Amino acid sequence: NDWCALGDWEVNEEKIKGGLPALAEKIHGLGLKFGLWVEPEMISEDSDLYREHPDWALKIPGRAMNRSRYQLNLDITRKEVREHIMNQIFKVLDACKADYVKWDMNRSVDNVFSAALPKERQGEVYHRYVLAVYEMMESLVQRYPDLLFESCSGGGGRFEAGMLYYSPQIWCSDNTDAIDRLKIQYGTSFGYPISTMGAHVSVCPNHQSGRTTPFETRGIVASAGTFGYELDLMKMSE
């Protein structure tokens, strides 16, 4: 759930019998591709990683931490943090042979203070953070050149050329309302081709706006992007 375990990128085989390799094999056997969601830049306070390394979260000494979606930003400006997270993810991906990875980011970067830098160098943290993201993504695409990799602008507003160097598509916005998406995708198209815009047909009424929009409209808007479905297909008619 949203409250725990971000930072602990290990498979719970009590929930998934045979682990991800068995699940991926079953999915592939159906003629489908297998994808995984990850959020490598974040950490939950209720996680083994935070209990072991509380200093690995960005937080300003003497100030209350700002939590968003019950999570904090990992201090990925530190090499040991980057390596720990990516090694966990590599272990999972090596085992399951995933075809697709969604690199999510559900909150902006704040509590900006790194325990690894002196006070007079804290102004470097934002820049170092972005360079760290690029380094982590570089390691991912170098290791898995055939992987379809999608990054996210939802929390961090990071729809930009630097991210597209590593991921050919970016989740355009967490707002999936088709009417709102008309403006979002139209505006994005001034800077980027529609092939880069993550766009899905979502549930109705929409989660964010509560709006009811015809299925055809939602499909047309999503097709002006990468096109996908973000709903329970088992509840749909043929």
What is the predicted role of each segment?
Residues 1, 84-118:
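Active-site groove signature of glycoside hydrolases
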Residues 1-84, 100:
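Aromatic-lined carbohydrate-binding/catalytic grooves of carbohydrate-active enzymes
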Residues 17-32, 125-144:
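Alpha-helix-loop-beta-strand connector modules within alpha/beta enzyme cores
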Residues 27, 85, 104, 149, ...:
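Conserved, mostly hydrophobic/aromatic
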Residues 34-38, 101-103, 150-151, 229:
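Hydrophobic faces of well-ordered beta-strands that scaffold small-molecule active sites
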Residues 39-43, 106-108, 152-156:
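Active-site beta-loop-alpha junctions enriched in small/polar residues
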Residues 66-97, 165, 198-203, 219, ...:
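Alpha-amylase-like alpha-glycosidases and glucanotransferases acting on alpha-linked glucans and related
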Residues 133-238:
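Active-site-proximal substrate-binding groove within the catalytic cores of carbohydrate-active enzymes
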